[in-house]
Amino acid sequence: MRIVMILVALLALGGCTRWAMNSHLNNANRAYAQGDCDAVMYNLSKVDRESRSRRYVQPEVSMLRGQCLERQKFYMDAVQSYQFIITQYPESEYAFRAKARLDTLHQLGHDNLAPPATPRPASR
């Protein structure tokens, strides 16, 4: 009987964690709709902490983070978020959306603001 009680308690705790994660993700989406990127980033950091074992949430979190970075004009950081989605989750719908965002940023000229640095040997 004790084993059954312990299993029920563990299942209940797992459900609470998932509920809290979904709540934070919903709050992040609501804040994004209102244009409050600080609240978005705060809620996404909570989702990150609570979803370490749930990798399926990461593409959605990264996509929302990239969109907020774009809104704040941190284009290179947004590009890196989108590239992360494409490399880590190439088959997800978020990879398709990330490619579209990268195309848009490229058309607007925000994807490569400065040429990459070329290393040169120090002169003696």
Where are the language model's segments positioned?
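Short solvent-exposed coil/turn linkers within tandem alpha-helical repeat scaffolds
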Residues: 48-57, 86-100
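Sec-dependent bacterial lipoprotein signal peptides
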Residues: 1-16
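Bacterial Sec signal peptide processing site at the extreme N-terminus
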Residues: 13-34, 43-46, 51
